Amino acid sequence: ICVRLVGSEMCIRDREYFITNPEDERVADFIGLSNHKLRQLREKDGGDMAPYFIGEGIIVINRALTVEHKLLTLIISEKFDHSQITTTPKGCNIFRCSPSVLEAITGRPNLKDPIGTFLRPPQSTFEELTHKANLIVLTESVQNPTNMGMVMRNAAAFGVDAVLFDPQSCDPFYRRAVRVSMGQVFSLSLIHI
């Protein structure tokens, strides 16, 4: 491991940084992730997090990488061995965070699973999905991200080709929905109708 100093922070290798201050601007977008109402507002259309989605856990992150979603940032604890992540793309920032930073981000000083920020994939059109899909699920007013995650997980298990979700349904890429689906949401074609 190559260690060099960058300003007052330690850079463990290119694009991997040790963050000790919760006020560090590099982690500002992640502070308060445990406040789900605020996070959901930020993730809605027009919010600052709308072009991104958050994946938590090794399984979820690896599944997102398998279908070639672009990993932008990886937040890990001081002792996390990121060799468990199948591949870390070039240009991905890795923030190895102290307990105080992790507590500001998640509400807990310890982080068992990594947190990744990905670029949200483009949506297919209704015509593209319905033309090639044999089995489609339509959600109606599934507002709870946990329930949406279970819908995605079950849809993948039953070989569903596409999931259409109505305007009253929550985003299947909400952090909790992605986690509950165990990353199965990435194997489905989705469209907001």
Model regions and ranges:
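Single conserved hydrophobic/aromatic residue that forms the stacking wall/gate
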Residues: 1-12, 191-192
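Boundary-proximal intrinsically disordered activation/regulatory segments immediately upstream
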Residues: 8, 13-78
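A glycine-rich helix N-cap at a beta->alpha junction
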Residues: 92-98
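Glycine/small-residue-rich loop that forms an oxyanion/phosphate-binding "nest" at active or ligand-binding sites
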Residues: 97, 103-106
